[in-house]
Amino acid sequence: MTLKFVKKQNEVGDVWSFFFEPLEPVDFVAGQYLNLTMPGVPPAVSDRLFTIASAPHEPLLQFTTIIGPSHFKQKLNSLKTGQEVEADQLGGDFTWEAVPSALSNDGVKRLFIAGGIGITPYLSIIRYLIHKQQPINATLLYAGKNEKRPFVEELHTAVEIDPTLIIKEYSETRLTLEQLKKDVPNVEHYIVYLAGSQAFSEALGEGLIEDGFPRQQIKYDYFDGYVDLEY
């Protein structure tokens, strides 16, 4: 599919959002990803997976990322309005709807854990549920330095709209397994979603599993290329 670049906006620090108009309808589920192919970039590094930050009902596709020195990121950051990029490989089960078959989707508790830019799939899900006027019924643990955590104000507004969304923020202290279990003492009753750098997500996920948490109740969305959180 072809996407036409519309605009970019700074979210916080070196975190930017890029907005594209799809030239054909994109039928996706909140929390899924697309692969973008950047023109003018060597083939070996011209592709990258991005979680879609926008919700399915929104007219533009939003991708949010940290702008670094890579050839791909620099090309993305230099796109002009009207330029086109190709997208494919729509997929992913890091979604509200995808829960283990042994659990009922009605009334299931969800624990969203985000490290920095890993907030994007949750943003898509939260926007979608608010649009549908469907209770979120989730706890979000959001970790990372303030200059690495976009959309904080929007998330606070979401809590005002729907108090069934509970947010705990970790900007000064590291979110460890011990802190997680302290802040969510009945974590074994949740489906746990983990999104962020591989090191961040695996440290918490594997720690839970070692404590006896069912592996099938953990969902991962790794953000390749990002180092562990900075505090």
PLM regions and their residue ranges:
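FNR/FR-type flavoprotein reductase catalytic core
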Residues: 68-231
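Ferredoxin-reductase
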Residues: 2-84, 88, 144-146
